[in-house]
Amino acid sequence: QAARVPEPLTPPIDKSTCHRSQAHVGRERWTFPLLAGIFLGCLWITNTWGVPLATVTAGLILLARPRSSIRMTVVQGALILSPAAFVALPFQANYVPAYGAPAEELPAFLARLPVAGWFLRTVGIVVSERSSFGELLRTHGPLLVSGLVALVATFRASDHQPVRPAVLASAVGFALVAGLASATPALVVFGLPLAGLAWVLWRERTAAPERLAALAMLAAAWSAILAVEFFYLRDVFGDRMNTVFKVYFDAWVLQAIAVPPLLLHALANWKSWGKSMAIAVVGFSLLAAAPYTPLSVWKWTDGFAQLIGLDGLAYLRQAHPDEFRAITWLRESTRPDAVVLEASGCSYSMVGALPHNRVSMATGRATILGWEGHEYQWRRGSARDLATLQKRRELLLRFFQEPGMETVPSVLSTYGISYVFVGTLERTGLGPNCPFLRSPAAEALGTVLQQIGWAPVYQDGAVTIYAPVVRR
C-alpha cells in the first residue's frame, strides 16, 4: 500500500490577502516620499544646515530599496523634492541666508555664474584643521566600533563565509597604522568602512527594506563625517566649526538609529566564536566611553567644589544680587510684550560675572539690540538689515554715552521703549574687550529721562529702572 503523502504545512493562499499586501506596498511607495518631503521642507525652515545630510539620507534609502527601477526611483525622488519645495517656499521667499561668502570675494565672472558662483560662495574647502586619529576615536568611538562590528557581521552573513581571525586582526592592525600615519585619518577610519558598506549594500539589495534603510542611514552618517574633513559651509567665522558640530549631531542620531537593529540582526545569525568576540568588542567600547560624562562633570565643577544645580541664574544671584532682584522684578511685574532698553553687548562677554544683554536674556523681554556679533552673523546676508543694525548701534551709543534732549526722546518713541534699565554695565561700561559703550553717562541719562517725564519705578543698589510717568 502506497504511503500517504502528508498534507502541506503551508496554508492555502488567500487572494484577498495578496491584494491587501500589494496595496500596502503600493501605498508605502508613495507615502514615504511624500512624508519625507514634508519633513525635509520643515527642516529647511528650522535647521537649514541639516538639509544636505537629510537629503542624502533620503536619497540613499530610495536607492537601496529592493525591486525599485530607475524610473520608480526618479519618480519617488521627485515626490520628495516637490512637497519639500512647497512647504519651504513661503519661508524661502523672505529668507536671507546668513551663510556664504560675499560675492566680492570671488572674481566677477565667477560670482555672476548662476549655480557655480553660488556654490563657490557657499562651500569652502578645508585646507587645515583636519581631525586627528585620536580626536576621531574620542568623538565617534562607541558608535563607530558598534557600526564596524555590525558591518563585519553583516558582511559575514551576506557572504556566508566565516571571518578568519587572522584576516580580521590584520585589517584592524593596518587601519590603526594607516590612521596614525595619515595626514587625513578620516579617510582610513571612515573611508575604508564606507567602501565595505557600499559593497554590502550592493550584495544585500534584495534584503528586507528595513535592513537596507538602516544600512543607508549608516552610509549617510559616515559619508557626512568624512565630508566635513574636506568641505564646510562658509559662514562668518571662516572655518568649519559650525559645520562640524551641526553635522556631527545629525550623524550621531543616524548611527544611534541604524546600528542597533543591524547589530542585533547580524549577531542573531552568527553562531561561531565571532559572536562572543563581537559582543565583547562592543561592550568594551561602550564601557571605555562611559567614564566621559562623570569625569567631564568632575572637571568642569572643580571636583564639585560648590553646589551648582540647574538654576542658570544662581551665579547672578550670588555675584550681583541687586541685578538679580531687578531682573526678577521685571519678569514678574511687566507685560510679556514690554520693551526694555539696556546696553547692547558683545557675544559671550562678561564683566565681573555679569553677562552682556543679561536683562533681555533672563526676562524674555525684547530689547532693540542683542549681542553685536550674533546680530551681525544672523543678518550678514542683507545689506538693508546690516544698515539697520548700524543705525541702532549708533543710536544706542549716543543714548548711553551722550544723552541729550534730542537723542533720548527719539530713541524711546521710535522703538516703543517701555523701560530703561540702568545697572552696573550701563554705569561702568562693557569692559576692555568690547568696543561698545566705553564711557557711559548714567547720571546725565537719568537727568534727561526725568526731564522728559520718566521716573524711577525700581531702585536697588546699582540698578535703577525708569518708566514713563502715568499722568492722571
Regions found by a protein language model. Give the residues of each.
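Extracytoplasmic
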Residues: 284, 291-472
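Transmembrane helical bundles and short interhelical boundary loops of multi-pass, membrane-embedded
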Residues: 76, 80-357, 426-427
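Specific aromatic-rich, kink-prone transmembrane helix
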Residues: 1, 57-58, 63-64
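Membrane-interface alpha helices of multi-pass inner-membrane proteins
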Residues: 33-46, 173-179
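Transmembrane-embedded, aromatic-rich helix segments that form part
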Residues: 50-60, 188-191
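Membrane-interfacial, low-structure loops and terminal tails that flank and connect transmembrane helices
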Residues: 2-35, 70-71, 160-169, 204-211, ...
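Residue-level signature of the transmembrane alpha-helical core
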Residues: 34, 38, 55-59, 286
